[in-house]
Regions:
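ABC-family P-loop ATPase nucleotide-binding domain
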Residues: 1-74, 374-406
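Conserved ABC ATPase signature
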Residues: 218-223, 227
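Short catalytic/signature loops enriched in Gly
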Residues: 58-64, 140, 213, 306-406
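ABC ATPase NBD coupling module
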Residues: 137-160, 186, 309-314, 344-350
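P-loop NTP-binding/switch modules centered on Walker-like glycine-rich loops
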Residues: 245-249, 253-334
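A short, proline-enriched helix->beta-strand linker immediately N-terminal to the Walker B motif
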Residues: 238-242
Length: 406
């Protein structure tokens, strides 16, 4: 019996390998088709002297600074199309912090790179959907249609990004001052070197940098991790942006410096009267900082709502699993909780719920098509059959109570 089981396992493994095997001919065909798509998309991006009317749009709600509407951002590889962001829709209201959370590879960073139009070219492309941006001048831009030369005027001035690795984001051969001044020269052509230096030193003071004049003259390798991150924040603030995207801003920093950076971001949001899109896998950071939370899994949003709704009343089993994974001080010698299984192959995603094979709440309905998004409250939504069943039961019981009163 044991011999038969081992043989069956080998057969199943072989079938699995054959199922995902891609022949040279298939790779060649895929590469050819992807090359055609990339060429067409790049042609659109590289157009010059495009009339503004082509990428002007209207905000669905004027109180939002950004609206992601059915965004699809793909990577066209020889092995196939990686759907890194697959139909993402959410808003970033003015004067708020929206936290985007999920494990590595869920698409949260690609979402932000699509907003900044910094996806790795030529493979990385915004394939479809809209990203509506509410500019400081009152105009609304569809970022997905803004040509490259016009995007250079928006990026850095209207919206800026704090990257997760300051050591690799800063140029090691230029002094800090040169890198800060460069942004000002780009967006304010009439500024003098003396004015740029004064503004850069002021920004270093704003982010709490001790001896800003000294830091201005140093190279990145002469600064600590926390100091480099403060430089990145100063750089992001240089042009008084409407929106700051903070991608894992506390990565590789010790807890004390992490707390300082988070406090700094919170105070900056109030000072500039702007919004922050905070990307992290750390639910503790999200709980402390965010007004609204978007939970992503395998390129899609599985749950979103206010921070209170997500933490007090999580509806999706993945969100529950993420919360259970947070280490607690009272665990004693218990094992830390982990979500079993792995994320599906991004090139060959299933047509059912992406979390199904890892879910401990799975039932018959989960074998059907990908679940639709349902509203739990005006601000809380989830894509899950279990939540759908619970909502239906609650609605039925409420109807029963009403009929009983009659």
């Amino acid at each position: 019996m044991k011999l038969f089981d081992n043989l069956q396992k080998k057969i199943d493994k072989k079938k699995s390998i054959q199922k995902h095997y891609i022949s040279k001919e298939q790779i060649k065909q895929t590469a050819k088709e992807n090359s055609r798509i990339i060429k067409e998309l790049e042609k659109q991006n590289n157009r010059k002297n495009v009339p503004e009317e082509e990428y002007l749009t209207k905000m669905r709600d004027s109180n939002n600074v950004v609206e992601f509407d059915d965004l699809h951002a793909y990577f066209f590889t020889d092995a196939g199309i990686v759907k890194a962001v697959d139909g993402v829709s959410f808003d970033i209201p003015k004067k708020s912090i929206v936290g985007v959370v999920g494990e590595s590879g869920c698409g949260k960073s690609v979402t932000s790179l699509a907003l900044m139009k910094l996806m790795q070219k030529p493979q990385g492309q915004i394939f479809s959907g809209e990203i509506r941006y509410n500019a400081k001048d009152g105009k609304a831009y569809n970022i997905s249609k803004v040509p490259r030369e016009d995007m250079n005027k928006i990026r850095g001035k209207e919206m800026s990004m704090i990257f997760q690795e300051p050591m690799t984001s800063l140029n090691p051969v230029f002094r800090i001052g040169d890198q800060l001044d460069e942004i000002l020269f780009l967006h304010f052509p009439g500024i003098t070197p003396e004015e740029a230096k004064e503004k850069s030193i002021t920004m270093l003071k704003t982010v709490g940098m001790a001896m800003p004049e000294s830091v201005y003259s140093r190279y990145p390798h002469e600064l600590s991790g926390g100091m480099r991150q403060r430089v990145m924040i100063a750089m992001a603030l240089s042009c008084d942006p409407n929106l700051i995207i903070a991608d894992e801003p506390t990565t590789a920093l010790d807890v004390t410096i992490q707390a300082q950076i988070l406090d700094l971001l919170r105070s900056i949001k109030n000072d500039i009267n702007g919004s922050i899109m905070l990307i992290t896998h750390d639910l503790g950071v999200i709980a402390e900082m965010a007004d609204y939370v978007v939970v992503m899994y395998a390129g899609r949003i599985i749950e979103k709502g206010t921070a209170r709704e997500i933490y007090k009343n999580p509806q999706h089993p993945y969100t529950v699993g993420l919360q259970k994974s947070i280490p607690a001080l009272n665990l004693n010698d218990e094992k830390l909780y982990t979500i079993p299984g792995t994320v599906p192959n991004p090139i060959n995603m299933p047509n059912y719920c992406y979390f199904r094979d890892r879910c401990n709440k799975r039932f018959g309905k989960c074998d059907g098509e990908y679940p639709a998004t349902i509203q739990i409250s005006p601000t809380h939504s989830v894509a899950c059959y279990l939540a759908e069943e619970i909502a239906a039961e609650l609605a039925k019981s409420k109807d029963g109570e009403k009929n009983a009163k009659k």
